[in-house]
């Protein structure tokens, strides 16, 4: 078939239009990213309230600052309950300081969403995350997850005598030899307490108190107590802390009780009043990227919702564990009850 000169010119023009259109489409996301970065640089920083361990939160901050020069991360790390308390006290004083808030108490996000204190924002790629890591309304997403376990010092206790179930730690032989973290400080432990109340009732904690466990604050703290041998058995704590200690050569062994382990998904969200909203969006995209989700798995031993994250061979997969899950709305409604009853039984 022969083409006339006019047909040839028309075909060339069409090809050129399609090429230019394709280039414009591919350039649009890059241009938008450049515009966001420039806007974030004008803001200068992002303020992050987080319950993530300080070494890891500072590492994430440095990685972000390296990736995006000109935008600093101001890290404020403390326990989940303290974060919420500080945020609410600041708002009462009309102080709007925090951009991105991350705690280990999913119930906090029910409250914050009800009070319209969260910005609806969907980080890039989270559509692929597991359902349990996503708010159906798009206000918050699970940055990380852990499970609560029992752990013991293998130099003080043999594997044969170590507790294997949650009720095993109620045996009087463990009196004065246990350590527990506190739900008044830790969101991880608040979730743990409610999960075991569902499983065994408040009588479980009344009986546990009779064994006089040492009280510490964070879900991270029992690990050091067990590793030192000061108290040889932890009745709770994030599995990742014990895993880290064991990898460093400490005499720590982890027990995943057969009745199930409480799963704690720790959300992250941008506040609706964020003073640095562009930096907050940029930072949120960054922490939910595969690269940073992998950092959390590698450096902290944490679980994440990202489907491409790889885990060490010696870590059980979430799908292989019997998980005890708590409804965030119930956790929020019963938060004060959890803290009050715990103090009633343990005295502090």
Where are these regions (language model features)?
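Extracytoplasmic ligand-binding site segments that recognize negatively charged/polar headgroups
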Residues: 49-61, 73-92, 96-230
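Bacterial N-terminal signal peptides
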Residues: 13-26
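Immediate post-signal peptide segment of exported/extracytoplasmic ligand-binding proteins
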Residues: 31-47, 65-66, 171-176
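A ligand-binding cleft/hinge motif common to bilobed small-molecule-binding domains
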Residues: 107-111, 232-251, 300-301
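Short beta-strand->loop
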Residues: 118-125, 138-141, 167, 244-262, ...
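Periplasmic-binding protein-like
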Residues: 131, 146, 174-184, 206-209, 215-216, 287-311, ...
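A bilobed periplasmic-binding-protein/Venus flytrap-type ligand-binding module shared by bacterial periplasmic
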Residues: 149-156, 194, 264-276, 295-296
């Amino acid at each position: 078939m022969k083409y006339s000169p006019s047909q040839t010119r028309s075909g060339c023009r069409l090809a050129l239009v399609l090429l230019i259109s394709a280039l414009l489409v591919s350039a649009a996301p890059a241009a938008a990213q450049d515009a966001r970065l420039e806007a974030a640089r004008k803001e200068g920083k992002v303020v992050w309230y987080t319950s993530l361990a300080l070494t890891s939160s500072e590492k994430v901050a440095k990685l972000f600052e390296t990736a995006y020069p000109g935008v600093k991360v101001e890290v404020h790390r403390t326990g989940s309950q303290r974060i919420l308390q500080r945020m609410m006290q600041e708002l009462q004083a009309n102080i709007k300081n925090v951009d991105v808030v991350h705690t280990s108490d999913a119930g906090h996000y029910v409250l914050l969403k009800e009070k319209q204190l969260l910005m609806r924002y969907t980080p890039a790629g989270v559509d692929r995350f597991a359902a349990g890591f996503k708010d159906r309304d798009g206000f918050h997403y699970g940055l990380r997850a852990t499970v609560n376990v029992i752990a013991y010092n293998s130099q003080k206790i043999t594997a044969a005598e170590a507790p294997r179930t949650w009720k095993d730690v109620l045996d009087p032989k463990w009196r004065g030899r246990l350590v527990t973290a506190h739900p008044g400080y830790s969101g991880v432990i608040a979730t743990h307490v409610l999960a075991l109340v569902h499983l065994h009732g408040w009588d479980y904690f009344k009986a546990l108190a009779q064994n006089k466990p040492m009280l510490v604050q964070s879900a991270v703290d029992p690990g050091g107590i067990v590793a030192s041998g000061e108290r040889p058995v932890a009745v709770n704590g994030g599995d990742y802390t014990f895993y880290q200690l064991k990898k460093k050569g400490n005499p720590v062994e982890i027990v995943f009780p057969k009745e199930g382990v409480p799963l704690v998904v720790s959300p992250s969200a941008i506040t609706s009043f964020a003073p640095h909203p562009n930096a907050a969006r940029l930072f949120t995209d960054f922490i939910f990227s595969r690269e940073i989700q992998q950092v959390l798995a590698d450096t902290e031993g944490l679980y994440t919702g990202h489907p491409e994250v790889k885990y060490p061979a010696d870590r059980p997969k979430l799908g292989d564990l019997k998980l005890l899950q708590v409804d965030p709305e119930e956790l929020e409604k019963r938060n004060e009850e959890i803290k009050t009853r715990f103090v009633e039984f343990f005295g502090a």
